[in-house]
Structure formats: structure tokens, C-alpha cells
UniProtKB/Swiss-Prot annotation:
The protein's name: Ubiquitin-fold modifier 1
SUPFAM superfamilies to which the protein is assigned, alphabetical: Ubiquitin-like
GO cellular component: cytoplasm; nucleus
Naturally occurring in which organism (per UniProt): Argas monolakensis
Glycyl lysine isopeptide (Gly-Lys) (interchain with K-? in acceptor proteins) cross-link site: G83
Amino acid sequence: MSKITFKITLTSDPKLPFKVLRVPENTPFTAVLKFAAEEFKVPPATSAIITDDGIGINPSQTAGDIFLKHGSDLRLIPRDRVGLRWTR
């Protein structure tokens, strides 16, 4: 089984830290997203992965599919209060 390498950059930090993750190509991308978020100490439930061009990635694919469609350089965006609705 071949492995895929992703470079995931944390966009919320001005220093733009990154992690290099190497995973089997059939790994569910939701697991990659969760692991990357935990490595950066941000909540995985409210985080998203985008491409360098700003295109959102649907995580319900395999790591191999993401790599073929979007390449290896990705960005992690921790989102705060996603879907929160203020009512008074």
C-alpha cells in the first residue's frame, strides 16, 4: 500500500506553522483532518481544510482522492462559532 504526504499549514497563526503528515492512500480524509487539528491543538469539529487557492475540500473522500484532486499543500482553518445564530 502506498502512502501520501500532505503539508498542512495552520492559517490562523501569523507564523504559518505547518505539519507534514504521511498517511496510507485509502485513509479517510476525515481522519487526516482530525489528526491535523489535534496536532495544532485546535478543535477538529469546527475545523476545515482548504487548498492554497482557497477552495474548500469535502473531507468525505479518501486521502488518495484528495491528493489527486488538490495536491499535497493544504491549509487548516479553525472556524469559530460555525453556524451560530444570535437571537434575542
